[in-house]
Amino acid sequence: MLASIFSLNVIQTALELGCIYALVALALFLSYSILNIADLSTDGCFTLGCAVACQVALTGHPFLALLAAMAAGVCSGFVTAFLQTRLGVESIMAGIIVNTGLYTINLAVMGFSSTMSLVKTETVFSIAKRALSFTGGWYKLVLAAAVIALAGAAMVRASSINPAFTITVGLCISGALTALSGGLLAQYQKSCDINVGTGMVTIALASLIIGETLVGRRTMVRRVLGVVFGSCLYRFIVAVALRFNVPAAAMKLVSAIIVAVAISMPAIKEKIAFEKRRSAARTRKEGV
């Protein structure tokens, strides 16, 4: 049983999806941790990137599809920032408004169909398979890791943005990363669904907290690496749950439990440390 859980295929898939979804976690890291803004447009922006990438990829331009997805994400981030900085809308409400509007926009991009397929369409991953044939079956991970490396470098630079432009530029970068993640996922699984972004903000938050708890947050580079690690670990936990034949209908519950545990981890660690200190103090007192 353990051999099947820790099989190379499970680990590889978890790493591939972890790198793709890590872009969303990095976007949330920028908006939530650096800008201190609760951006709730993540779900809709992710689906927007997925839908735009699908439409452009269908025309035979998979790489242009990713750029188009990022451009769409920038537009989403700009609207969110405009509502906050120019119209005085609270960040949470701005995210909700944009997320609500994006549902109709996403449907329109998808031709008012709830699903799209790229089964017979060339994707960046099929191109990478030919270009990176020397990597064997690891070409998807190599491509996803390369994107993460570029995004991580951009994230470190973004942390020093002039405060005067922080909200607008930061949310535009955040939207671009989120939409890029959606575009990559669309080409990875060769499909798009109108509900693909549902719950994405909570999943990204879980990845962010897992990474910061296990890796730490002393330096910006360490925090970025922690986000990627947290995303991969989250995907591995989901893969293990599937290996235990957890019904697909129960995966939302599994995700909710993972998120709850991840969010409470700092408090749990603090409580354990406090109990250890109290126990040590009691032992010293009894020794005296």
Per-range role (PLM):
Residues 91, 95-153, 192-194, 250, ...:
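Transmembrane helix-bundle core of multi-pass membrane transporters
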Residues 32-87, 107-113, 127-134, 243:
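Membrane-embedded helix boundary and interhelical linker motif in transport proteins
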Residues 6, 162-165, 218, 237-288:
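Cytosolic-side transmembrane-helix boundaries in multi-pass membrane proteins
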Residues 61-100, 142-145, 149, 230, ...:
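Alpha-helical transmembrane segments within multi-pass membrane transporters and channels
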Residues 175-252:
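Transmembrane alpha-helical segments in multi-pass inner-membrane proteins
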Residues 76, 135-201, 206:
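Helix-loop-helix "hairpin" substructures at the membrane interface of multi-pass membrane proteins
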Residues 17, 91-93, 140-145, 196-203, ...:
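Loop-to-transmembrane alpha-helix initiation sites
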Residues 1-24, 58-64, 138:
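Membrane-interfacial amphipathic/re-entrant helices at transmembrane-helix boundaries
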